[in-house]
């Protein structure tokens, strides 16, 4: 009995000591945080209204880097606070800031997206989190990360690209590059993710997906006629289309129609779960296919448009790309598809792609949410505040890139090392774009065929890409085509 009382007393004392120690640490932490100032900037009325207007104004001229540079110059700091997409937000403005943020995923910060992004993918009466979306995407794309997975998809992608040119470019005197690029990248994404080849389904789904993507940064107002309302309806229709495809694919699996010989993500996922006796809800699969497709097709189409624009404006660079691609084509037999080895030879073309991404990255960056108060560069980042890393902070910054406004693909072949975390078109850390190699693949294959088939000029010489908030061509970038004799 005495021993039991002694043990209970000891346990009580230890519990009290732990409790007081916790209170001491928490109090010191809070006091330390309170001593730190917030980053400089404006988040209160009426200043945040003018901050938002200034950001939007510069986005419309694709000069967000000036919005950031002006505040860096004004505050003399590597971060500042502002109001962005309705949130108190801290912008990190250096390569060191990018590294800090990418290195602290799930430690100090977690991924965050505007509420409209999540609402688009919700079912009625259902709520989802950013983490659920990211986890599902990684599960789906795990098949893309298998050894030699990229090489297996080169021939398929090459065939889709060739079919696209035959249908929409060959025989045309003028084309709108941006809408056709979106059609191409959507076709490629649907083929690789779900082996969708039915033209009727593809043509119905593409404008629906456009509605979905446009709503990611829209005002969170869900009334008939609003951008968000159209996106939610479009997302539901897309889910219905994909549920029907999934049911058909399950039927093929049960009838042993060689589904395990397909390389698309959906078929591989169904076969794997069937073999292991697991079942996945069709609506869950369809919802995540919509989410994946929204990420997979939009950004590559913008980069294709950017490259076509830049090559039209710089004939000497166009000629170097064409010369490289003609040399690669000479090694191929008639009708032979491109291979991974061919793609690896596209070194100058890859430099052009990289430089286009530096100057005209499709997305400005992504967001994190502070999991707790933390100190960055002597400033307090409060729990719940949003933190933004942006390509515009470093991609056009002379501290990291000489002559940053000049389109110079050779900067990626020189021996000058690029400062780590200064070139981040695909993000970094746990949330680096999982499909980046596939995006590069389809863009390079597009370049291979377009420069061998055509020379072109812009119909509107002054047309440039703008942001609202992501990059796009406001007039579609129409170009006049001057075809070459072409042998496949």
UniProtKB/Swiss-Prot annotation:
> Its pathway?
Secondary metabolite biosynthesis; terpenoid biosynthesis
MF-aspect GO terms: heme binding; iron ion binding; monooxygenase activity; oxidoreductase activity, acting on paired donors, with incorporation or reduction of molecular oxygen
The cofactor named in the record is: heme
What is the membrane topology here?
A: Single-pass membrane protein
SUPFAM superfamilies linked: Cytochrome P450
Listed under GO cellular component are:
membrane
Q: Which InterPro entries match?
A: Cyt_P450 (IPR001128), Cyt_P450_CS (IPR017972), Cyt_P450_E_grp-I (IPR002401), Cyt_P450_sf (IPR036396)
Q: In which tissues is it expressed?
A: Expressed in maturing fruits and in juice vesicles.
Residues given in the record as heme binding sites: 433
Keywords attached to this Swiss-Prot or TrEMBL record, sorted alphabetically, are: Heme, Iron, Membrane, Metal-binding, Monooxygenase, Oxidoreductase, Transmembrane, Transmembrane helix
EC number(s): the record gives 1.14.14.-
Which residue ranges run through the membrane? 5-25
State the protein's purpose.
Monooxygenase involved in the biosynthesis of limonoids triterpene natural products such as limonin, a compound with insecticidal activity responsible for the bitter taste in citrus. Catalyzes the formation of (1R,2R,3S,8R,10R,11R,15S,16S)-3-(acetyloxy)-15-(1-hydroxy-4-oxobutan-2-yl)-2,7,7,11,16-pentamethyl-5-oxo-6-oxatetracyclo[9.7.0.0(2,8).0(12,16)]octadec-12-en-10-yl acetate.
Record protein name field: Cytochrome P450 family 716 subfamily AD polypeptide 2
Organism expressing this protein natively: Citrus sinensis (Sweet orange)
Per the UniProt record, the lineage of the source organism begins with: Eukaryota, Viridiplantae, Streptophyta, Embryophyta, Tracheophyta
């Amino acid at each position: 009995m005495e021993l039991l009382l002694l043990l209970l007393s000891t346990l009580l004392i230890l519990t009290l000591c732990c409790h007081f120690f916790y209170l001491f640490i928490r109090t010191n932490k809070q006091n330390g945080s309170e001593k730190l100032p917030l980053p400089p900037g404006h988040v209160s009325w009426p200043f945040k209204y003018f901050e938002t207007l200034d950001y939007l104004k510069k986005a419309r001229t694709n000069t967000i880097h000036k919005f950031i540079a002006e505040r860096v110059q004004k505050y003399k700091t590597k971060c500042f606070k502002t109001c962005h997409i309705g949130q108190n937000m801290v912008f990190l403005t250096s390569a060191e800031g990018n590294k800090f943020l990418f290195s602290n995923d799930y430690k100090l910060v977690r991924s965050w997206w505007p509420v409209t992004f999540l609402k688009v993918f919700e079912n009625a009466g259902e709520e989802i989190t950013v983490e659920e979306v990211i986890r599902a995407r990684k599960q789906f794309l795990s098949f893309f990360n298998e050894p030699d997975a990229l090489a297996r998809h080169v021939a398929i992608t090459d065939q889709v690209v060739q079919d696209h040119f035959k249908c929409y470019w060959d025989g045309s005197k003028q084309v709108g590059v941006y809408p056709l690029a979106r059609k191409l990248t959507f076709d490629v994404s649907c083929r690789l993710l779900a082996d969708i080849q039915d033209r009727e389904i593809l043509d119905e789904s593409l404008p629906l997906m456009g509605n979905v993507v446009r709503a990611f940064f829209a005002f969170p107002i869900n009334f008939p006629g609003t951008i968000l309302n159209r996106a939610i309806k479009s997302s539901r229709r897309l889910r219905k289309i994909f549920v029907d495809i999934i049911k058909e694919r399950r039927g093929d699996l049960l009838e042993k129609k060689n589904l395990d010989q397909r390389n698309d993500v959906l078929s591989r996922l169904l076969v794997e779960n069937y073999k292991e006796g697991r079942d996945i809800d069709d609506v869950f699969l369809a919802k995540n296919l919509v989410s994946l497709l929204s990420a997979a097709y939009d950004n590559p189409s913008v980069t294709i448009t950017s490259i076509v624009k830049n090559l039209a404006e710089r004939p000497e660079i166009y000629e170097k790309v064409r010369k490289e691609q003609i040399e690669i084509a000479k090694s191929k037999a008639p009708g032979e598809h491109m291979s991974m080895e061919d793609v690896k030879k596209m070194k100058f073309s890859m430099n052009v792609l990289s430089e286009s991404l530096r100057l005209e990255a499709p997305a400005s960056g992504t967001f994190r949410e502070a999991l707790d108060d933390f100190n960055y560069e002597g400033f307090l980042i409060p729990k719940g505040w949003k933190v933004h890393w942006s390509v515009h902070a470093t991609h056009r910054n002379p501290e990291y890139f000489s002559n940053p406004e000049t389109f110079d693909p050779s900067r990626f072949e020189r021996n000058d090392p690029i400062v780590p975390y200064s070139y981040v078109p695909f993000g970094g850390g746990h949330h680096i774009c999982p499909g980046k190699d596939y995006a590069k693949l389809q863009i390079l294959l597009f370049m291979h065929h377009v420069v061998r088939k055509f020379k072109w000029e812009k119909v509107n010489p002054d047309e440039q890409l703008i942001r609202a908030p992501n990059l796009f061509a406001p007039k579609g970038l129409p170009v006049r085509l001057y075809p070459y004799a072409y042998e496949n």
